[in-house]
Design a protein with these regions (language model features):
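Active-site-adjacent helix/loop patches that line small-molecule binding or acyl-intermediate pockets
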Residues: 1-56, 70-74
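Structured C-terminal helix/loop/strand segments within mature extracytoplasmic catalytic/sensor domains
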Residues: 60, 64-180
Length: 180
């Protein structure tokens, strides 16, 4: 994790930090013990069935934790550099973009209200009251616009949070399409 934060800093992105791997982040969120993650979760959920719905409910302590955070501006700056080939080698930029274009989660988020044929290269994040999506939306003519949309500490249904992201993304896309 420290190496990722250092790399982001080298890209000029300071409002981003990576402190834990995904395994540790999930263990901290669900307050799980050691051992294989799936087994630890299943054991904890048997003892406390409310854990099964925790993944879509806000957790004030978790939301206030400064670890593993990035401001939307920091994320957008990093993604702009990455998609433009300024942060990775040309080959790695192609691989990165292809991976982001294959994202199958969050179809109701950044891509949710895009016109048919619009390429959206994105990555979602969901935990507790946080629902987000970051990536690049293609524009006709070969350009694109990077969007980092976060909904944090929300008790609204996930579908409502996703719709907010989709509406923002479509508005941003249309603005850049028609303003240029």
């Amino acid at each position: 994790p420290e190496a990722v934060t250092a790399w982001a800093r080298a890209q000029g992105v300071n409002a981003m930090r990576v402190d834990r791997d995904t395994n540790r982040l999930l263990r901290d969120f669900y307050r799980l013990g050691e051992g294989p993650l799936t087994e630890a979760f299943e054991t904890a959920a048997k003892a406390d069935p409310s854990l099964l719905g925790k993944g879509s409910r806000p957790d004030a302590a978790f939301d206030a934790d400064p670890r593993d955070t990035a401001s939307p501006a920091a994320m957008a700056t990093l993604l702009t550099r990455m998609f433009a080939g300024k942060a990775l080698s040309p080959e790695s930029t192609k691989v990165f973009t292809a991976i982001m274009e294959r994202c199958r989660t969050g179809t109701a988020r950044l891509p949710g209200q895009m016109p048919p044929g619009t390429t959206v290269a994105h990555k979602t994040g969901t935990i507790g009251g946080t629902v987000n999506d970051v990536g690049m939306v293609s524009l006709p003519g070969g350009n694109g616009v990077v969007i980092a949309a976060y909904v944090k500490a929300s008790a609204s249904p996930v579908a409502d949070r996703e719709r907010a992201i989709a509406e923002i993304a479509r508005t941003v896309r249309d603005y850049f399409l028609f303003a240029n």
